[in-house]
Amino acid sequence: MTEQQILDKVQSIVSEQLGVERSQISPNASFTHDLGADSLDNVELVMAMEEEFDLEIPDSAAEQITTIQQAVDYILQHKKSLSQNNLSQNN
């Protein structure tokens, strides 16, 4: 999955969860300051991303993810780590 594909999915999740037009969701948009998310919204966003990308985001990491791009970077890094682990286990 490419960074652009992850960005598209994250933007879709945020748009759906927060009721914000996708055109308003830039990579640097802050969930709270720019998109109006509260703490419950943030929890729901993390849960939706965990489900969509089949990964677990620990609370400590979730607290550090405050923008769309940070979410994309975390997911991209986590997916790379999983892929590398799967490759090494299969060899």
UniProtKB/Swiss-Prot annotation:
Keywords: Chloroplast, Fatty acid biosynthesis, Fatty acid metabolism, Lipid biosynthesis, Lipid metabolism, Phosphopantetheine, Phosphoprotein, Plastid. Coiled coil: none annotated. It is found in: Plastid, Chloroplast. Pathway: Lipid metabolism; fatty acid biosynthesis. It holds the Pfam family PP-binding. GO terms for molecular function: acyl binding; acyl carrier activity. One of its GO terms (biological process) is lipid A biosynthetic process. It comes from the Eukaryota. GO terms for cellular component: chloroplast; cytosol; membrane. The modification O-(pantetheine 4'-phosphoryl)serine is found at S39. InterPro entries: ACP (IPR003231), ACP-like_sf (IPR036736), PP-bd_ACP (IPR009081). 4'-phosphopantetheine is transferred from CoA to a specific serine of apo-ACP by AcpS. This modification is essential for activity because fatty acids are bound in thioester linkage to the sulfhydryl of the prosthetic group. Residues 4-79 form the Carrier domain. Gene3D superfamilies: ACP-like. Its main location: plastid. Belongs to the acyl carrier protein (ACP) family. Carrier of the growing fatty acid chain in fatty acid biosynthesis. This is Acyl carrier protein. It comes from Cyanidioschyzon merolae (strain NIES-3377 / 10D) (Unicellular red alga). The gene is acpP.
